[in-house]
Each structure stands twice: as C-alpha cells, then as structure tokens.
Amino acid sequence: MEVAGYGTHNRDLKQWMVTLLSALSLMMVVVTIGLLALFLVFDIQVNSNSGQKSSNQLKDLQETNENLVDEIFIDSALNNRYIKNHVVGLTPEEDDTKADIVMVFQPPATGRRTVGKKTHHSILDQKTRNARALPADVSLVQVKDCGKRAIPLIANRIVSGNPAAKGAWPWQVSLQRSNIHQCGGTLIGNMWVVTAAHCFRTNSNPRQWTLSFGTTINPPLMKRDVRRIIMHERYRPPARDHDIALVQFSPRVTFSDEVRRICLPEPSASFPPNSTVYITGFGALYYGGESQNELREARVQIISNDICKKRHVYGNEIKRGMFCAGFLEGNYDACRGDSGGPLVIRDNKDTWYLIGIVSWGDNCGQKNKPGVYTQVTYYRHWIASKTGL
C-alpha cells in the first residue's frame, strides 16, 4: 500500500517501506464548514451546553470529511489506487477547521512508491472548489426538503449488492400486486411515485396494487393503496420507448427520516459520462434469481450514449429518452425486480436527484450489456403536467 501524507516531515523515510504514513494537514476551507459558519447556517444557538455539542459536531465533521474525500478520489484519476482515508485530527480555527488526514493508496505498477503531493493537492482543489459539508447535526435537515438523507453517504464503505442501511434511501418504494413485490418505484411527492410503465403491462388495475415503504418488504415500514396509475400515452409494448408511469396513492405520507421524496432535476440538467450514480432495489442478485426481502444498493457509472449505441453494446436500440449506466465489464447492475426503481446522483450540496428509472437490459451484469434507464430530464415536463411537481 501507498500512503500520501501532508503536514509532517517524512523525507528521511526509506523508499523500501511498503507503507508510508504521514499526516495530511489540509485547510478544508470549502469542504469543511467552520463551526461558526455552521451555527449561522443552521441557526444553532450557542448555550451553556455548547462545549458538549461542539464535541459532537467535531465528531460528525470528522466523518463528513472522510466521506467527502472518499467521493473525491473515487471519482478521480486515482480511483483504481485509492483505498481509504482517516481524519486523525480536527482543529477549529477562526473561520474554518483544519483537518489532519491520512490517505492510503495502492502503489503504482511502475514501481514508484510515492505519488507527488501536487497530484493530490490538484485533485482535492479541483473537486472541492464548489463542495460543502453536511450539517453536523443531521436532525437539523428539514424533512420537507427533497433529496435529503438522514444519514450521510459513506461512499467507499458501500459494498455493491449488499443490504442498505435503514433510512439510507428513503425514497425507495416497492410496488406490489397481491402483496408480492413486482417492481421498484421512487417517491417524488407525498402522494406520488414514479416508476416504469412496463411494470403495468399485464395489469394496470389500481385496486390490485399497493405500495410498501422501508428497507424491508416484510415487515414493511408502512403501506399505501394505489388510487391511480398513469402510463405514458406513447408507451406501446413491446417497444421500450416512453417506459415511464406515475402512481398516485392514498393516504398521503408524512415525511420522516425513513420516508422522504427525491428531488427531480430541471429539464435542462445534464449529467456527464463516468459520473458516479447509485441504484437500489429489491431485485434478484443474479439472472433468474428471486427478489430480495432487504433493499440493496450498488454504485455504478453513467455510460455515454456514444458507447452505449455501439454495435457490440445496444446499437440502435437506444432511443431518445434512454441512457445507460453500469460497467461494460459487467459486475453490478439492476436485475429482475429492480424495474421502475431509482438511479440517483448527489450534487455538491449533498442533495440527491432522480436521473434514471430502471427500464431494461440484456440479462443482469452481462459484459457489454449495461442497464438501460429512462431519462428523467427528458420526461420532466410530462411529470409536471400530470402531478404539478
């Protein structure tokens, strides 16, 4: 392993050492909001208990910084070599907080044992220029706000395909017929879910459908009755175009840490290829398998349309309003039972947006056959026209 460090003098360490540990003294002026700024932004009053609260906030800031550095290097040119980071110290200063961080990397194949400081500084500076940290007290997040999680994302601690933590993806919904999971869906309002139209190809009778919330199907956190199903007017199976539907349910849900709506992007929003995105669902773990009782999560990447439309991938099957995400080598992918579920992305203010709806693909995790998703921005006006959202 290789460790990149800052803030200490390690010039006397010998090159043959397998692990080089040093402290990263990085002024996280933008990445870490100083305690004074935090109090102002979230209107926290400093009182006689401020010492204890400050201690708790420093602990949360430590975790926040680790998460943010994870995200930075996972999305960087060093992602294949990055292992982890750890905050070894936080020092509050006048307007910000200084973080001492140890970062661990795999050594390069060339045999060089170290990576230049300028490389890491350049990546950190570029990636954090517009970033901001999570609030130290997550209970301060307004539950009415869209796209907010009650717990922070720990990016490199997600083992793709593993069960999701409680409250991690509060907009995930299970669409069920006769109490049996059929498809996923995404909560976009207190009475609306968006999903895939093909989920209702054989049965679109609202009375035979219910919605389940929470990270387990059985027992569910709560259930709701479906009142109306709106399939896109131009959806004509077996064609895969316009694979989107809206579900209206009752009674309305009250937003909480475990049930929250996702944000919808503006129609003009764009998301570049290779962006890190996340899929969740109760679907099978392999082709031909059964749906799972526990919600599972996976981290994938957006694949450009130029690549997805290549002959050996999907060719001219990719139409307007579709895009691909996953990995060409296979690995993690949506599968049977994940249809209609969310593909989400996080912005630099830790707000989550729904950018895709699980639509179709050849088998599950097959080489050169990534998942294909309905493009939410393409149908943003349609969603607004039906729901007012």
Swiss-Prot record:
Q: Which UniProt keywords apply?
A: Cell cycle, Disulfide bond, Glycoprotein, Hydrolase, Membrane, Protease, Serine protease, Signal-anchor, Transmembrane, Transmembrane helix
A matching Pfam family: Trypsin
TM regions (residue ranges): 24-44
Disulfide pairs?
A: 183-199, 308-324, 335-364
Specify the SEA domain's residue ranges. Answer: 31-148
Enzyme Commission no? 3.4.21.-
The molecule here is called Transmembrane protease serine 11A
